Amino acid sequence: MNKQSITYTILFTFAVTFVFVLLLSLTNQATVEIIERNERVDRQRAILQAMGLDVSEPEEVASRFQDVEEVEEDGLTLYAGTVDGSQVYAKEFRGSGLWGTIHGVLGVTADLSQTTGLSIIAHNETPGLGGRITEEWFQRQLEGEQIPQDRLLVTDGDGDYEYGNGEIDGITGATRTSDSMEVILNRELDTLKDALGGS
């Protein structure tokens, strides 16, 4: 066959494409269970971290997550557990950020007087700006933060050094993401209050 012909070019392109698509499909099939297991562990880790439990190893995540109970309250799926002898709840959320959906977990005490943690699972925010919501310093602000008047406030400026006042430092340069997080967190607090019968 003439290597300069259109027929050869089309057949060669088809054969190479077929081989690479086949290899890609086989790789996908071989790793689908691993990917699903890793996604499940990441989700469970996020729930545990939002409840105030710090876990890192996958085996530890699976072990600790066995103590978490999935509870249905008013059609919502909540996760209930005990941390240091106190009942805590966590709820997955999805809300609109600047560029897309922010998916995370918010944890609260049973009496809704304070948050126990925040964990961001996925987002589409700008790397280096709004994407900083996944950084430890941002998420740790919600560990033990008081919830005065059923609201959290994301602030800008010099920083919030008064821990436990219901104010969270926003991210400099990511005003829209910070505003979105305030809306999402307060919406979730309202939802949790309705589900758990808070005042």
Name each model feature, range by range:
Residues 2-199:
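Flexible, solvent-exposed loop/hinge segments and secondary-structure transition points
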